Regions:
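Macromolecular interaction modules
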Residues: 2-155
Length: 155
């Protein structure tokens, strides 16, 4: 995969069977919203060959959040924890949530529609061992994801 403006990409699957948000999540680091309006993005169909391998995972709901310039790598020993309900204040040992804010709201970005919801969320990358120890898989308001691909890093 090569797309100007995209620096990292990694796909994840929810750990809990009844995850409150999405069964699958893909996290990308992009330079700006202009990536989604580029000819290069349109030429790969906004998903490319990697998306063809994950057709069951793709519903084409996209959001762009500001708050992390470059999404960190998540190894097989790690998890991504998302919180879509920012009314909670999470104080968990060994877990630091980074607050994110929708960067665009609802709008068209080239061939891609961004829905802008939720307008705020938080993300943490933590050890799977910590997820188990704190029983985060069944903690209301949190969704836990494990990697299903290695992290792509643009050359």
């Amino acid at each position: 995969m090569s797309l100007p403006g995209l620096s990292t990409a990694q796909r994840f699957r929810a750990v809990a069977p009844r995850t409150p948000s999405w069964a699958y999540v893909a996290l990308y680091s992009v330079a700006s919203l202009d990536v989604f309006a580029s000819d290069a993005y349109r030429s790969i169909g906004g998903g490319g060959q990697a998306s063809a391998r994950f057709t069951e995972a793709i519903r084409r709901r996209r959001n762009v959040y500001a708050g992390i310039e470059r999404v960190p790598e998540v190894t097989d020993a790690g998890c991504v924890v998302l919180c879509d309900d920012m009314r909670h204040t999470w104080h968990l040992a060994d877990c630091l949530f980074v607050p994110l804010k929708a960067a665009a709201g609802r709008r068209q970005a080239g061939a891609t529609e961004l829905d802008g919801e939720p307008s705020r969320r938080a993300l943490a990358v933590i050890a799977a061992e910590t997820v188990d120890r704190l029983n985060l898989m069944v903690t209301e308001g949190l969704a836990v994801y494990t990697p299903i691909t290695k992290r792509y890093v643009s050359p």
